[in-house]
Amino acid sequence: MLDVTWEWIAIDKAALDVANTVVVEKGVEHDLLASDPAYQRWAAAAARSSELMPVETAALASAQAPIVEVRKHIRALFHATAAGEPLPKAAVARLNKASRAAPQWPELGTNHQIEQIAIGDAVDRLLARYARSAMEIAADGRAKLRVCGAPSCGMFYRPRRDPQRWCSEPCGNRARFARHYRAHRRTSSRSRMRT
């Protein structure tokens, strides 16, 4: 069992956070939302890290199956986007459907504030939020979405600078260490062969 603490890569892009609930450890993918207790921990953390309304927070706690299903399409969309490939038709269709299920528009209040109005049930609004977030990321294009190149990571991230190849410093450190280890191992095996 993986020991998980939720690290939010992009608070402003909820789709990245839901997509990154599938992690790679020693070359094996692990679904961090597969068990109900793990999903409930993630849902509680997701509710705290975003601007969910109370009704959406309650909906999140009971939306494991639809979240996991939409996540599958978000991940397919992100893999294609990061690779510069055409977007999968099934993923586009499912995310468009999720977005349409909860129409949203801004309205100006008498207090000079703009309020976002959304219709549809709370689960539909939640799925629409993730779908729209994924659409925005995919529309930004390949240069703005990458898959971490560190060993045993594979998380999606948006680089803060152009040459960035890892989602975080710890991943960069692991990648550099692995590269150094491989180079050192090759050098030492060559010197043993000569003697």
Regions found by a protein language model. Name each.
Residues 153-158, 172, 176:
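Short functional micro-motifs and their immediate structural scaffolds
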Residues 17, 175-178:
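Alpha-helical elements of the RecA-like P-loop NTPase motor core of helicases
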Residues 1-147, 151, 155-156, 190-195:
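Short helix-coil boundary/hinge micro-motifs
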